[in-house]
Amino acid sequence: MNAPKKLPADVAEELATTAQKLVQAGKGILAADESTQTIKKRFDNIKLENTIENRASYRDLLFGTKGLGKFISGAILFEETLFQKNEAGVPMVNLLHNENIIPGIKVDKGLVNIPCTDEEKSTQGLDGLAERCKEYYKAGARFAKWRTVLVIDTAKGKPTDLSNHETAWGLARYASICQQNRLVPIVEPEILADGPHSIEVCAVVTQKVLSCVFKALQENGVLLEGALLKPNMVTAGYECTAKTTTQDVGFLTVRTLRRTVPPALPGVVFLSGGQSEEEASVNLNSINALGPHPWALTFSYGRALQASVLNTWQGKKENVAKAREVLLQRAEANSLATYGKYKGGAGGENAGASLYEKKYVY
């Protein structure tokens, strides 16, 4: 039997230690790795020009928030941000270190169509990844993220077996390359909420996808103790007319994880997937209320941590302090949800606004 080569002991130990820190009790990950194109959409909503200076100001707002490290363990950055400084000349990475927040980096290069499929997607970025990982590590990154996308369409048989295999194998190759270069890989197989499918269909598809992913991780020799999973919660499609409860989401999500995710994995950091800020917190709470679990179940939210922050900031310096208060409020709500102790209501009515975008591109 030809097994993959083992990682050196010191590398394995470093990866496992970092992974555990990222999912430490009461903390989650801030996903701030929007591409330049995606952050333009965010800025357009508040009528702010998408310049490098404005992007730096916004990231400075987020990472310079005093007390953020109480609720946030890591922050995923876009490549520009990893090497960026704020207006005062302080590197963004240093702002994170000041709060004991671990910097991470988005390493995928976006989506392309898989040939011979009905526009199912493959993720680019494996070419040159090892060299980039070395540079990112030197710049202070200690973990990475790679997003894949699948769509449910029962009438068309999506996701196909080919899509499942492509997703799983690409994630496993990425994870292996990251670990060889001392970066903890966050493995993100996102099943989009697009469509009218039921929550039960989402559960079946998610179970199959995660089974494929962990099979591929094993075949590629990925150290599970030094990796994290970033999946969708099990929810109904956005256009589904059947009503579901947060308890349904909690039960089916936990059941799916128990059927597929080995306990060697330190933690699962859920994506918000277009849920409102409040939904993302309440559903995370329902998931953790069903504990104890063999892994930490926490969050890696982008829109569900930032939407109200952006709306409060509006690109104006005089709004920075208030926007930071909003960020802390939302981060604390999700921290409470990791214990199953969130009672709801943080952020008021605005936090209930849908953040769904069809065919979401990050």
From Swiss-Prot:
Keywords associated with the record: Actin-binding, Cytoplasm, Glycolysis, Host cell membrane, Host membrane, Lyase, Membrane, Schiff base
Transmembrane segment boundaries: none
Record keyword Transmembrane helix present: no
Activity control note: The cytoplasmic tail of TRAP and probably other adhesins acts as a competitive inhibitor as the binding sites of the glycolytic substrate fructose 1,6-bisphosphate and TRAP partially overlap. Inhibited by suramin, an antiparasitic drug used to treat Trypanosome-mediated infection.
Pathway: Carbohydrate degradation; glycolysis; D-glyceraldehyde 3-phosphate and glycerone phosphate from D-glucose: step 4/4
Residues holding beta-D-fructose 1,6-bisphosphate: 42, 272-274, 300, 303
Active site: 188 (proton acceptor), 230 (schiff-base intermediate with dihydroxyacetone phosphate)
Residues reported in the UniProt entry to bind D-glyceraldehyde 3-phosphate: 35, 38, 106, 188
Site, as annotated: Necessary for preference for fructose 1,6-bisphosphate over fructose 1-phosphate: 362
Gene Ontology cellular component terms for the protein in this record: cytoplasm; host cell plasma membrane; membrane
Molecular function terms, GO-annotated: actin binding; fructose-bisphosphate aldolase activity
Cross-referenced InterPro entries: Aldolase_I_AS, Aldolase_TIM, FBA_I
Family of the protein in this entry: Belongs to the class I fructose-bisphosphate aldolase family.
Protein name, entry field: Fructose-bisphosphate aldolase
Lineage: Eukaryota, Sar, Alveolata, Apicomplexa, Aconoidasida
